[in-house]
Amino acid sequence: MTHYDVVVLGAGPGGYVAAIRAAQLGLSTAVVEPKYWGGICLNVGCIPSKVLLHNAELAHIFTKEAKTFGISGDASFDYGIAYDRSRKVSEGRVAGVHFLMKKNKITEIHGYGRFTDANTLSVELSEGVPETPLKVTFNNVIIATGSKTRLVPGTLLSTNVITYEEQILTRELPDSIVIVGAGAIGIEFGYVLKNYGVDVTIVEFLPRAMPNEDAEVSKEIEKQFKKMGIKILTGTKVESISDNGSHVLVAVSKDGQFQELKADKVLQAIGFAPNVDGYGLDKVGVALTADKAVDIDDYMQTNVSHIYAIGDVTGKLQLAHVAEAQGVVAAEAIAGAETLALSDYRMMPRATFCQPNVASFGLTEQQARDGGYDVVVAKFPFTANAKAHGMGDPSGFVKLVADAKYGELLGGHMIGHNVSELLPELTLAQKWDLTATELVRNVHTHPTLSEALQECFHGLIGHMINF
């Protein structure tokens, strides 16, 4: 069969989830994917990086905090074994995607698909299968082609100038590295590499690390990374990158002052651009935004009624869980099933998984004030949380921003041990318009890190208990 109710172009977190939901709703479904089943996330992104981050955390504990926990003796850390574990976990999750495709009777088409008309894809099949392109027709299609790494203007990749993909797929570590970009990817790789003995310098063009986070969170992560020995150069522009084969020279400037950084490797991590080229979108009239992303409405529908788009290619919030949520909505919209529109991507959760974690949703304090809200803020430090002390890591805080008039949450900003696990309570509260007065009555288990949320709920209405 080469005609389907729904064809999904791309098998990343959004694509495969959309396919499963479509199949659950009784639609004949196929997925077209040339390389990474499970997407960047499962193969060379979210999943293997979290394995490496956990290994790095253990290395940090044994090298920097062993005495605190009564641990003594020599320990060695083999990055090659950590790498092997990351690949094993990744491969297991990818196998899980194939299992789910089979379980839900979804057809896998291994190849590169492009539109030839509004209801047809021509698929160049992968090696080991017939070379003649496969013609696949459909009633509806979901574009889930993801994104590609943006590079510093005027620079190129080379043997020693790499992206996250090359770094996460190597067992060998450099002695030194310059990471361009202090967003989530730059921060996470900086944490991993430093804890395995690499000399790390992070260069950020904007005035602070993690510039999309609340200013107080940025200040705290800079402090914690400085304690680890990671150098962060903020407000610094990369002028050029030169790879001579044995090392890389990075020319940077700040306030009219120039310097040259020398390292074994340079990792470019300044962000991602939607993958819109080479798929024939122009042939079917799919509209793009000014930022060259596929333009969608709140139900993931493009300007062509039977063509939908999800994930990074839409240029919304480029995170795996956002793509998954979009995929569910797209499939339900196609099937005519009950669904819920997605509109305000500012309120989606986001996290960076170094230790301490950085986790947030919604408006920063400054954004809320700039937006004209009458703002109330509560901030609770983990130095006042018993569980954090028991874990040996009381760094960081929870900061909540609320509308003073109605008491509803506008944003949450956290830095601390595993605070990414605290986000769902906050985003659920925001989505269903719960107020601080209501939230404070939700009893939190003692002792847990989540008690910091309860303290902030108390703080928003003027009576924090334990601080």
Swiss-Prot record:
Catalytically driven reaction(s): N(6)-[(R)-dihydrolipoyl]-L-lysyl-[protein] + NAD(+) = N(6)-[(R)-lipoyl]-L-lysyl-[protein] + NADH + H(+)
EC numbers: 1.8.1.4
Disulfide links within the chain: 41-46
Signal peptide (residue range): none
GO molecular function per UniProt: dihydrolipoyl dehydrogenase (NADH) activity; flavin adenine dinucleotide binding
Cofactor note: Binds 1 FAD per subunit.
Keywords noted in UniProt: Cytoplasm, Disulfide bond, FAD, Flavoprotein, NAD, Oxidoreductase, Redox-active center
A Pfam family recorded for this sequence: Pyr_redox_2
Chain sites annotated for binding FAD: 33-41, 50, 113, 312, 320
Subcellular location: Cytoplasm
Any one GO biological process: 2-oxoglutarate metabolic process
Source organism superkingdom: Bacteria
Residues the record lists as binding NAD(+): 181-185, 204, 269-272
Cofactor names: FAD
Single GO cellular component term: cytoplasm
Family named by the database record: Belongs to the class-I pyridine nucleotide-disulfide oxidoreductase family.
Complex and partners: Homodimer. Part of the PDH complex, consisting of multiple copies of AceE (E1), DlaT (E2) and Lpd (E3), and of the BCKADH complex, consisting of multiple copies of BkdA/BkdB (E1), BkdC (E2) and Lpd (E3).
Additional record remark: The active site is a redox-active disulfide bond.
Protein name in UniProt: Dihydrolipoyl dehydrogenase
Organism: Mycobacterium leprae (strain TN)
